[in-house]
Amino acid sequence: MAQTDKPTCIPPELPKMLKEFAKAAIRAQPQDLIQWGADYFEALSRGETPPVREQSERVALCNWAELTPEVLKILHSQVAGRLIVHAEELAQMWKVVNLPADLFNSVMNVGRFTEEIEWLKFLALACSALGVTITKTLKIVCEVLSCDHNGGLPRIPFSTFQFLYTYIAEVDGEISASHVSRMLNYIEQEVIGPDGLITVNDFTQNPRVWLE
């Protein structure tokens, strides 16, 4: 008699594989996510590098607008300082600026967002499609959120940077919480001035700050 109640064995490496797939999907922004996913895992099974389409190729193949910091600034201005945005409203904003629906869905899936979305978290993951590395992602987020409108270096409150760095590192899964804590403590104690702001150069040009 065949057994039907055998326990399902989940490989320990599966969560990491799925996380890497989700991040790769955000960066590739494929038109057909299902086919792209099939090609991705087929390449992995053969021990090959998974497919990643170049941005120029993506633009040439579709009529969608290109995701840029400027487009994200438009979305941020429409959010108008709110911490929470409803998924339906954000999807409509995304559609109005003509960004790919698959990219929106990928960000939603990676962030495990539901009906009510924390805007800063969504923005951080959208920026990761452009930034590739954590440092570059945070640089783009700072440019989008910058409170300096006089042509100076992009800068944001350190508390906001702390929240974003902690969240992005958590989603990435490759950086220990202790490393994140050490970097934040160093920046807060040795870099941040009395205004409580952090500039892009504070974490991109300082040799003692290594966010990855």
Curated annotation (Swiss-Prot):
UniProt keyword annotations, A-Z: Cell projection, Cilium, Flagellum, Phosphoprotein, Ubl conjugation
GO molecular function, one term: protein heterodimerization activity
UniProt keyword Ubl conjugation present: yes
Principal cellular location given in the protein's record: other
Protein modification: Sumoylated, sumoylation decreases upon spermatozoa capacitation conditions.
Subcellular location: Cell projection, Cilium, Flagellum
A single BP term in Gene Ontology: flagellated sperm motility
Coiled-coil region(s): none
Keyword check for ATP-binding: no
Record region (Interaction with RHPN1): 209-212
Modified residues (Phosphoserine): S56
Domain spans labelled RIIa: 12-49
GO cellular-component term (any): motile cilium
The family this protein is said to belong to: Belongs to the ropporin family.
Subunit structure: Homodimer. Interacts with AKAP3. May interact with SPA17. Interacts with RHPN1. Interacts with FSCB; the interaction increases upon spermatozoa capacitation conditions. Interacts with CFAP61.
Biological role stated in the UniProt entry: Important for male fertility. With ROPN1L, involved in fibrous sheath integrity and sperm motility, plays a role in PKA-dependent signaling processes required for spermatozoa capacitation.
Protein name as it appears in the record: Ropporin-1
Organism: Macaca fascicularis
